[in-house]
Amino acid sequence: MLVVLSGGGTAGHINPALALAEVLEERGVEVRFAGTPRGVESRLVPEAGIAFQPFEASGFNRKHPLSLVKALKLISHSTKEAKRWFSEIEPSAVVGFGGYVSIPVARAAEQMGIPVVVHEQN
């Protein structure tokens, strides 16, 4: 069984994901992690010995409508990329821990019929 965890931006999203990863691995479940290439997860996840897959994602500023266009384009692009990745690794489930990167990853899983769990602790 393989489970993909996803989250990004702050340690508040990453630390709970790493705790779940530890428990899953103790039970023999393979874990992969989807995050942003510039967030704290890009350092913490590999340091924990978990395979890391980067996806682009960003928030938007309501005062600057073009930032919404950029964010939506990134969601669309990263959703397609996540679907390609899922086709290769065939995860049994996806768990989203928050952060903008969780949107395209969960969306791709839902579109492919992969069970999605959302754990937003804050």
Briefly describe each language-model feature range.
Residues 4, 32, 94-95, 117:
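Structural detector of well-ordered beta-strand residues that form the stable sheet scaffold
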Residues 10-11, 15, 99-101:
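Residue-level detector of alpha-helix initiation sites
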Residues 13-24:
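Short amphipathic alpha-helix
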Residues 24-25, 109:
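Hydrophobic alpha-helical packing residues
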Residues 30, 40, 51, 111-122:
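Active-site-proximal region of nucleotide-activated glycan assembly enzymes
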Residues 54-58, 97-98, 118-122:
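Short beta->alpha connector loops at strand-helix junctions that form conserved
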Residues 81-94, 102-117:
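Glycosyltransferases and closely related glycan-assembly transferases
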